[in-house]
């Protein structure tokens, strides 16, 4: 058993607590709620505040693998205080990757000023840029993807005049315009094959529309979409037979861990109009991949006539995906939730321990498959923030906790959404000068 340690955190403005203290058997009403969560060893402290704004102090005691936090709270200037029942946080033996990469973007509909790809060290509150849109005259920067979660080999899109896909491989940085090689199609939603040579992309013609007086005021949808492959050895691209068919919309490719199967989402239809969007339901499908060739047999993994799947992510026999009422852009769907499939049995369930009344969308597994990071709008319904949960390997997730911040109010002060979180195994080096040289 680890030695017992006591940490006293004075989070109140007053130097001392009131003299009259009563006790409560309830946990303290705090935000974010971190009572009973499971955390990785060495993560930055999970700071919180009282929901009602009262001053407080917190005493944290670690016994073995459990951190107990006792909170005493009082109104400013009052002689009376309440000490709440200590609440636990379980420290897991399963390690977590040291960094998370994501995009930060203002949640506007049409325009943005600043956006960029950033990385957060989980052992601290330190956030550093990977690439911002200052490199390409404030164009769009998005669609980052890492080979095997490596900070030394990855790609991202930098759009606008002279734009393309930026490929990083150690000290080498290059720009490839996918529309000028092979198929002539642009690529989004990249997924790097575990072997390192191939990358699957979706190639989509995307629109957004607004509705007045509708429960869904904005809708983003693909009019057309296919899946294409890139060979990084030759910088060539080609359409995948059976995954770029007329009469179908294919998107969101994702490789299995062994690289022997490609999962993707597919809906029926040549082209889709805004008026038809509510009738479009994407199924989960997969196709075998061996020795650089795809099988002609496409399997249906999951399908529902009244729901749509997106973002399939495989972890051994488990597949985590986002389910929404329809369409292919769940971030604007309040009903969007995370679902888990057992690929061996075919059983599917709503991950109620992670879901909320608001949007849950993009998600990513850690490299050891024991943690998941996902995006949620549960705090205010507008800004997307990141939550982390432990996975026991048997189909169960722990209560999620909000990405720790030095002060909880930072979550309200940051007027940007976290987008496409991905675990990475180390810190990405600063290559800003090399990126800027690509766009001169």
Where are the predicted features?
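Sequence signature of WD/YWTD-type beta-propeller architectures
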Residues: 16-440
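Bacterial Sec-dependent N-terminal signal peptides
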Residues: 1-22
